[in-house]
Amino acid sequence: MKTSKSKFLNFVKKYPLFKNFYYFYNIYIRNYKFLNNGSQFGEEKFILSFFNKAHKGKFVDIGCFHPTRHNNTYKMYKSGWRGINIDLNPLTINLFNFARPKDININAAISDNEENKTLYFVDELNTQNTLEANHLLFLKNQLNQEYIIHGPQHQYS
């Protein structure tokens, strides 16, 4: 279910008193944490098998998306590793702060130049949220998919 279509969840996210329920829902219930967690293609399994079990490493996850679902560092975090998670979506960072408080979680965009950028949301939690409107047009033309652009939402500089 998309969060934006749920009247109950839209109510819950408006009131700070309920924000922890909203985060819990997005981390554990919505994404079936008990069935599907960790990276999409098992990248972290290779990294963990490369080091011995006692090794507690560090990581940087740029474009971290979600604390458990399709996340390349979730199993490393559960194994005692600690790191920095960076994403341009404020909701993503709030979810990381809730689920992974021992990490450093930063709401920022990474760029090779300093300029104001507009953030375009495809959906509240989506891997295609972007700073580039052209990227959404490319996806629409190449994949023949319709995207609703909710942005501009935030200005980054």
Predicted features and spans:
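Phosphate/nucleotide-binding beta-alpha loop and adjacent structural elements of enzyme active sites
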Residues: 1-157
